[in-house]
A protein has these predicted regions:
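Single conserved hydrophobic/aromatic residue that forms the stacking wall/gate
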Residues: 284-292
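PLP-dependent amino-acid enzyme catalytic core
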Residues: 2-285
Length: 292
């Protein structure tokens, strides 16, 4: 009888440990001399970096005793955090309610429903502020309900400090000069930055935000088309002390760079990934030759 020693008990055990890949085709196309390496978070079970956050926030709430078995989790989100939370909540037996503007796509709603989430739509004109208010109203009405608050929850950034950053350091054998990430909640860039700078304080950390809404640099909040980053406010988790540079990326350039990852690498990536790649390849950011 064959014994399978590495069979996961459930999908939560497959979160993290995502591979790194050199963007060799993209680098050749633009004559870039440095090694640009992408961390393929799409290899997570629900398809994004937010799987890490969903698991971390739920396990943290369990450990603190605020989330009881079978309880209701509420979160205002229209993005991949909702997908990650839905997957983990289903596995762990929680009821998940997601509040989001009615302007969100039918496809996104159907995906979340398929994963077991209950969708509560709010006035589209009120944006995410309306969804946040609705989440608080539901929490106050439902006994034992918990809002995980991804923009404020320290376990969000801690997940990236303990996993994402450490994985990058390990899998590059410490050959990292610059780390670039978009800012939505701020958890990825700041958490990973803390881990990397513990190993080497000279690693240069770049935060990416939409040029249309450059709030991290003190600019005015405004609509933009880079889904997944640019919350139009400075998140509580964003720690400017670990960020060396903020690069604003135009919407059209982020979209184009995302498409070029597909044509140059066969890599299907979102607009926020395109923004990060643009920040590396279309700015004055300089990296030492033959380093990541």
């Amino acid at each position: 009888m064959m014994i399978m020693a590495k069979i996961a008990k459930n999908l939560t055990e497959l979160i993290g440990g995502t591979p790194l890949m050199k963007l060799a085709g993209y680098s050749r196309k633009y004559g870039l001399q440095q090694d640009i390496v992408a961390k393929l978070e799409s290899f997570n079970p629900a398809g994004s970096v937010k799987d890490r956050v969903g698991l971390a926030m739920i396990e943290d709430a369990e450990a603190r005793g605020v989330l009881k078995p079978g309880a209701t989790i509420i979160e205002p989100t229209s993005g991949n955090t909702g997908v990650g939370l839905a997957m983990v909540a289903t596995i762990k037996g929680y009821h998940l309610m997601l509040t989001m503007p009615e302007t969100m796509s039918i496809e996104r709603r159907n995906l979340l429903k398929a994963l077991g989430a209950e969708i509560v739509l709010t006035d589209g004109m009120a944006g995410m502020a309306g969804s946040i208010a609705k989440a608080k109203e539901l929490r106050d009405r439902i006994p034992g309900a918990v809002i995980l608050q991804q923009f404020e929850n320290p376990s969000n950034a801690k997940a990236h400090e303990l996993t994402t950053g450490e994985e990058i350091w390990r899998d590059t054998d410490g050959q990292v000069d610059v780390f670039v990430a978009g800012v939505g909640t701020g958890g990825t860039v700041c958490g990973a930055a803390r881990a990397l700078k513990k190993h080497n304080p000279d690693i240069y950390i770049v935060a990416v935000e939409p040029a249309s809404s450059p709030v991290l640099e003190g600019g005015e909040a405004a609509p933009h088309r880079i889904q997944g980053i640019g919350a139009n406010f400075v998140p509580a988790l964003y720690d400017a002390s670990v960020v060396d540079e903020v690069i604003p990326v135009p919407d059209d350039e982020a979209i184009r760079a995302g498409r070029e990852l597909a044509s140059a690498e066969g890599l299907l990536a979102g607009i926020s990934s395109g923004a990060a790649v643009y920040a590396v390849s279309y700015t004055h950011l300089t990296l030492p030759t033959n380093r990541e």
